[in-house]
Amino acid sequence: MILLTGATGTVGKALLPMLVEGGEEIRALVRDPRRLGRHRVAVRITLGDLGEMGDARTRRQALRGVQTVIHLAAAIRDQPVAKVEELNGLATARLLRAAEETGVERFIFFSAIGATEFERTRFFRAKALAEAAVEGSDIATTVFAPSIVYDRNDPWVTLTRRLSLLPALPLVGRADAAYEPIWAQDVARCVIAELDGAKPGKRRYELAGPERLTYEEMSRVIAWSIDRRRQTVHVPANLIRLGLNGVRRVVGDAAFATWEEAELLEVPMVSERGTADAEALGVKPKRMADVLAA
């Protein structure tokens, strides 16, 4: 059996159908099973989220009978129950330790290209600490470190399309951080290839798309996908931070975006290996423009 966390996220939505169609027995750790859609009836469900990884009962229930863990779940903003550091770093360490104690054979973890303990953003620092814990485990582990992952209707693409309806497309700061965007379907295919491929061991893959684009260039590609040719306007990061923090204070967790999320768009996510790791798994990543135009 496979335990899948983050099944309702961008990568999870792409991966879950592939696992189900491949005949895998899946248990999904989710807060709201309704978000699993039609696949809800095809999987076992454990109610919970990253904030509940401190609860031993939740961990035991989630890992009962599990041979492989695929840990996709992540949080890029603080939640009422815990901070970003706890939701990404500590929760991963707890799940990993429980997996070791219950005899799980394989732990697949999603980190991020560029995640280091010295990165300025809290999310990347937490991911780096979690990755170090995973790589230090005694069980077989695979780390996937992707660049920015997108899908046709994910929240980031949807928000950018809505912003492109304005007379000018607003961007955070200089918008010159570089990325190698990779489609969620291509990422999911890499996971399937790893599951079906070589004997479990200690491996790490950097997953990147075929193009190196700045945040501004990605935003233009998204706008062009709905025939919106807009000039861009660069809003100073300090103003964005003040505005988003103000919105958060007024509406709380219902805020459409937070500064922690916006700040991530100033952090480069590029791999020196390009698409080599994905291609080694038999996946040739598609261009962002081609995916969004389909």
Can you say where each PLM-predicted feature lies in the sequence?
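N-terminal Rossmann NAD(P)H-binding glycine-rich loop of SDR-like oxidoreductase domains
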Residues: I2-E24
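Oxidoreductase cofactor-interface core, primarily capturing Rossmann-like NAD(P)-dependent enzymes
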Residues: L15, G22, E117-R228
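NAD(P)H-binding glycine-rich loop region in Rossmannoid oxidoreductase-like domains
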Residues: R34-R38, V43-R94, A98-E101, I113-E117
